[in-house]
Design a protein with these regions (language model features):
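Beta-strand-rich interaction surfaces with strong enrichment in secreted/lumenal proteins
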Residues: 189, 345-349, 433, 471
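The feature marks long extracellular or luminal low-complexity segments
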Residues: 271, 292-409, 413, 449, ...
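Single conserved hydrophobic/aromatic residue that forms the stacking wall/gate
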Residues: 472-481
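Short, solvent-exposed loop/linker segments at the N-terminal edge
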Residues: 307-314, 417-418, 425, 432-439
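Secretory targeting signatures
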Residues: 1-62, 244-250, 295-300, 318-322, ...
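Surface-exposed loop/turn positions
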Residues: 59, 196, 314-316, 333, ...
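Acidic, serine/threonine-rich low-complexity disordered tracts
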Residues: 30-137, 153-306, 397-401
Length: 481
């Protein structure tokens, strides 16, 4: 009896600890059949940069999910028909406050999540019954870049063993896992752009507590880790959720180059529409958005930055705008402006037009997500600190090599969609880059203006697989990055 319950606990324990791991990234290699027709239906006129969202207390995301354990169970040698646990996950913003993160004053979100997973009518080493897992999580998220500062999870595991006509409830154990990251783990690098990649070295400190009659609680650990990320494509995530037809696939590998998952960021829901975590031990966790409930914004805060892409150590302007939910400007609103990377915190008040002007120095500080393309991308925040706090956010990217107009095509950022009989699919290496006659192939080609000024109309020359040259006129101005 004891050994069988121990097996049950170990399977679920290893699975849920994997939720704290990273996400994976595939490489792209475009190969179209020479015999198939190809046509370009649309070309993006500028790169679709996605800036950081601002959250509010009571924003809520609900997910349906499953935990696939097939490969892990096969490798473990356990005699069981358990393959997946299915369940739900609900995440809610419950607080917004200022705290100290790595010796820096930082505005953070507190996000509380409740997860429930079950597998009914399973057999574990001859024991029939139902497996249930409840998990409560508290995550601290830095508001300026949505980096994860820490996570606290409490996991309750129960196995209801069938006995004649009854079910004997066995409490396998309760596990408490606290994990902190230094520097905070940047799973996003705003503004998001297809083809952009970044890496981060960080220290993960994990402490364990809890109780179990069957398994020893693990020892605390401190480990040095590396995560590598890339925005590999934009398009349909596979989840049919309103307003999320265009989402952004952020994938990553660990220090050994192993795939560890992906997530699809959807700007319309201010978060992820789909998440997958691949654990090297042999199981996968997948969650798909079922509903997003945004709490009412009585006040809307936006930040307009003079030069979103800026030279280092330069005085620039920003305009913080406050309006009601009907778009009418609000005067005499007191806010706190925060450029936390340089410790620049100012109190500002909106004028009669609902706007407050502020100047700040971009500084010379690098961020902790090394992209190789710039020195750093840093969040700019404005918030109303009240019983009902409101936040606004934007990003400034600093680069020592900035010019007035600097256009280039990011070939690694090209996304490909294929439409076949009214079915549109984003192509990648898993699906395969192929087409048949009458398929419509749409290429989204990012043209980025990394300069400070709006560019004049220009022409993009494209050479097809057969050597045919196409000239695409970009008549609309390409705005700075």
């Amino acid at each position: 009896m004891r050994s069988r319950d121990t097996v049950t606990y170990s399977l679920v324990f290893l699975l849920l600890v994997s939720i704290f791991s990273g996400i994976y990234v595939p490489e792209k290699n475009l190969e179209l059949d020479e015999n198939n027709d190809m046509k370009i239906e649309s070309i993006s006129k500028n790169n679709n940069l996605i800036d950081i969202p601002a959250w509010k207390i009571n924003d809520r995301w609900n997910y349906n999910g499953y935990l696939d354990m097939v490969d892990f169970i096969v490798d473990s040698g356990v005699n069981t028909d358990l393959q997946t646990l299915t369940g739900t996950l609900e995440s809610t913003v419950t607080d917004i406050y200022v705290t100290t993160v790595d010796n820096s004053s930082s505005l953070v979100y507190k996000v509380e999540s409740q997860g429930y997973y079950e597998a009914n009518n399973i057999n574990l080493d001859g024991q029939p019954g139902d497996l249930e897992v409840n998990m409560d999580t508290i995550s601290i998220i830095r508001a300026s870049d949505l980096a994860t500062v820490s996570q606290e999870a409490t996991i309750d595991i129960n196995f209801c063993r069938d006995f004649l006509w009854w079910c004997v409830d066995i409490s396998v154990g309760t596990l408490e896992v606290d994990q902190s990251y230094s520097p905070p783990l940047e799973g996003y690098d705003f503004p998001l752009s297809v083809g952009e990649s970044w890496s981060q070295d960080y220290t993960a400190t994990t402490t364990y507590d809890g109780s179990s009659d069957y398994v020893d609680i693990p020892e605390d650990t401190v480990s040095q880790r590396t995560a590598n990320y890339e925005v590999v494509s934009q398009g349909f995530s596979g989840v049919s959720y309103a307003s999320c037809a265009t989402s952004y696939n952020i994938s990553s590998t660990n220090a050994d180059g192993e795939d560890t998952g992906y997530k699809w960021f959807c700007p319309a829901v201010r978060g992820d529409v789909k998440m997958e975590t691949i654990e090297s031990l042999g199981f996968t966790a997948v969650h798909s958005l079922s509903s997003y409930q945004a709490t009412s914004r009585q006040k809307v805060i936006s930040i307009d930055v003079e030069f979103p892409l800026s030279p280092i150590d330069m005085e620039i302007s920003a305009w913080v705008n406050v309006s009601n939910n009907n778009g009418n400007p609000l005067a005499n609103e007191q806010l706190q402006f925060r450029y936390e990377i340089e410790g620049d915190i100012q109190t500002i008040t909106t004028a009669s037009n609902g706007s407050a002007h502020v100047t700040f120095n971009t500084g010379t500080s690098a961020d902790n997500s090394d992209s190789g393309d710039d020195l750093g991308s840093h969040g700019i925040l404005a918030w109303i600190n009240s019983a009902n706090p409101h936040t606004g956010a934007s990003t400034v990217t600093i680069d020592p090599n900035v010019y007035e107009i600097d256009l280039y095509v990011n070939q690694d950022g090209v996304s490909v969609e294929r439409t076949r009989e009214n079915l549109t699919l984003t192509l990648d290496e898993n699906v395969g880059f192929n087409a048949i006659r009458d398929d419509a192939i749409t290429f989204s080609i990012p043209v980025i203006n990394r300069g400070l000024r709006v560019s004049p109309p220009t022409v993009l020359q494209i050479e097809g697989p057969d050597g045919t040259l196409s000239l695409i006129h970009i008549s609309e101005p390409t705005r700075p990055y």
